[in-house]
């Protein structure tokens, strides 16, 4: 996590140092999971892919540490599981559903996001769902990534036992490759960066990249920006990634242009727009008052 923090600070020397300390333990403490779905299955809780994750225990109803979790269950369309009893009480959250409060960018399911043959696509999202008996609903997409109960099959929506990842070893390695690219693209491309990229691609069922595929430092970064999108989708790290790359405003402009309720037909422009100050969250008033000193703690600009 310290290595990730240094990445957010653009301190690539320190990031490479601390991420490298983790990679030095590959084979003993850490390694890439053999299959992408193993990164999320309860069968591999606390495995070598899992650097840090929230702990859960399947088969017990509850939402506290050490008990089952309901996070996975919220992604199941109830009409697909009517025979499961409690499942039918909650409808699965589709990430392009009617509620704007839960709407995610449809760009994750768009054409050209995943390379042809990338196993991660169908292991991450699913569409063409039979939400009724008449016909499949091709325009409905559900997150599949966290529906991984190999050991303890849940009998209720909140009885899932698969741990929720906070930091995966794949993330450590891709951040390390990115840090090395920022430090010295020419020196590290063939010896360190390319092997990491290809290890992740191999697991996804994709062919290896060559040094000639990356003409310069920017080409590597462009690849990693897209690769992190498909590898870590729905894991909660895309936003801080976009912030540190200074791509958040561009990404949100694209997002707001895609969602129906965010589009003004009169002006033919998105109704909503991210402001530059939104890159930082507002500081709670209670924290500001606790210090009572503007030189120590004050509100971020724009709020």
Residues covered by each model-derived region:
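Elongated scaffold/linker segments in the mid-to-C-terminal portions of large proteins
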Residues: 21, 28-182, 248-303
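Generic structural signal for short, solvent-exposed loop/turn connectors between secondary structure elements
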Residues: 10-14, 129-132, 205, 215-219
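Extended, hydrophobic/aromatic-rich amphipathic alpha-helical segments that build helical scaffolds
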Residues: 1-23, 52, 118, 163-200, ...
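Alpha-helical junction/boundary sensor with strong preference for TPR arrays
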Residues: 26-27, 204
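A long, glycine-enriched binding/interface module in the latter
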Residues: 189-289
């Amino acid at each position: 996590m310290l290595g990730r923090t240094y990445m957010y600070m653009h301190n690539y020397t320190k990031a490479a140092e601390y991420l490298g300390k983790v990679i030095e333990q590959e084979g003993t403490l850490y390694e890439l999971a053999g299959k992408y779905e193993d990164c999320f299955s309860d069968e591999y809780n606390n495995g070598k892919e899992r650097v840090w994750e929230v702990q859960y225990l399947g088969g017990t109803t509850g939402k506290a540490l050490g008990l089952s979790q309901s996070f996975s269950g919220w992604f199941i369309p109830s009409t697909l599981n009517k025979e499961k009893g409690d499942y039918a009480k909650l409808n699965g959250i589709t990430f392009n559903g009617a509620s704007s409060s839960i709407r995610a960018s449809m760009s994750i399911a768009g054409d050209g996001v995943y390379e042809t043959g990338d196993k991660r696509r169908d292991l991450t999202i699913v569409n063409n769902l039979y939400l009724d008996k008449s016909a499949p609903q091709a325009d409905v997409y559900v997150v599949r990534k966290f529906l991984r109960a190999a050991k303890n099959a849940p009998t209720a929506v909140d009885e899932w036992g698969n741990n929720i990842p906070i930091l995966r070893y794949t993330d450590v390695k891709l951040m390390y490759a990115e840090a090395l690219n920022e430090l010295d693209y020419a020196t590290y491309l063939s010896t360190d960066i390319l092997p990491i990229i290809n290890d992740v691609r191999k697991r996804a069922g994709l062919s290896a990249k060559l040094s000639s595929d990356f003409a310069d430092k920017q080409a590597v970064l462009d690849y990693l920006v897209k690769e992190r999108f498909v590898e870590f989708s729905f894991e909660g790290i895309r936003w801080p990634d976009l912030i540190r790359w200074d791509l958040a405003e561009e990404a949100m402009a694209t997002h707001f242009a895609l969602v129906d309720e965010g589009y003004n037909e009169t002006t033919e422009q998105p109704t909503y727009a991210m402001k530059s100050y939104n890159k930082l969250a507002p500081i709670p008033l209670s924290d500001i008052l606790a210090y009572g000193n503007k030189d120590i703690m004050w509100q971020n600009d724009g709020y």
